[in-house]
Curated annotation (Swiss-Prot):
<dbReference type="GO" id="GO:0047820">
    <property type="term" value="F:D-glutamate cyclase activity"/>
</dbReference>
<comment type="similarity">
    <text>Belongs to the D-glutamate cyclase family.</text>
</comment>
<dbReference type="GO" id="GO:0006536">
    <property type="term" value="P:glutamate metabolic process"/>
</dbReference>
<dbReference type="GO" id="GO:0005739">
    <property type="term" value="C:mitochondrion"/>
</dbReference>
<dbReference type="InterPro" id="IPR038021">
    <property type="entry name" value="Putative_hydro-lyase"/>
</dbReference>
<keyword id="KW-0456">Lyase</keyword>
<dbReference type="GO" id="GO:0005829">
    <property type="term" value="C:cytosol"/>
</dbReference>
<dbReference type="InterPro" id="IPR016938">
    <property type="entry name" value="UPF0317"/>
</dbReference>
<dbReference type="InterPro" id="IPR009906">
    <property type="entry name" value="D-Glu_cyclase"/>
</dbReference>
<dbReference type="GO" id="GO:0005634">
    <property type="term" value="C:nucleus"/>
</dbReference>
<protein>
    <recommendedName>
        <fullName>Putative hydro-lyase C5H10.01</fullName>
        <ecNumber>4.2.1.-</ecNumber>
    </recommendedName>
</protein>
<dbReference type="Pfam" id="PF07286">
    <property type="entry name" value="D-Glu_cyclase"/>
</dbReference>
Amino acid sequence: MTTTSIDPPVYATVDVIREPKAYDGMPKKDECRLPSYSERAITKPVEARKLIRNRLMTKSTTGWCEGYIQANLLVLPAKYRDDFVNLCVRNPVPCPLLGETEIGKPTEFKPEALAKQSNVATDIPFYCEYINGKFSRELENISKEWTEDYVGFLIGCSFSFEAALVAENFIPRHLPTGDAPPMFITNIPLCASGVFTGTFVVSMRPYPEKDLERIRKITSAYTNCHGEPVAWGWDGAKKIGVKDCGKPDFGVPVEFKEGEIPIFWGCGVTPQNVVMMSKLPEPVYSHKPGYMYLTDLTHNC
């Protein structure tokens, strides 16, 4: 099989902690409680991935592994690789490409620093399958589905900057409950690439309007995880096609308090929306929105 040659992708720049130390204080499989934020935060990625792989952790990954980059996953037939890489290059806000796997090898990453001792086909709590642009089924792993002609892509996630918001006492509303944040399909067009076209997906977090500029500044440093917001306020919601902030397309609705406005960030679920709009005939796989891949990469502001 041959593919059209394009310039090598420039992956988002991150640092890496190469030998994470395992944390042994996590709840066992028969415990029903959600680990506290502090328990989730201090767990290292290598240990969290082991818990997920063994089905000991099946919740949303929000709040897990503070300081490390969380990633969205998209797995495609390799014949679409160049088109997808170019889509990310042309649309870096919703699709900040961190790296990819070797074709047919979900345990081998480019760059290698993305993760050690990991299989991206087993180390995410849940996966989604799409066929002809439609959701087909949810899976616990995709080892059998990941054949020798499939390649995976990892895209930065806004969960990665939530610890920075918490440090400034801007605690995301969904974080204490461990739910995925609300996410919305918008009318913001993407720059097309080959077979791929579509619109942005955004994640939303409510905050007091008076804190908007501070929140923009905090998240602007995380360009490899969508950076600062793309829209905010009730008028901003209407402009991007979000009619009801209480009815997300993905994730869980959150409560608004008096004086709060919706703030929207680019979201790595965008590639799933692209797959649905592009209606690829072959099976395509992704993470379940809100259930991310925990990398060994860390952001250095």
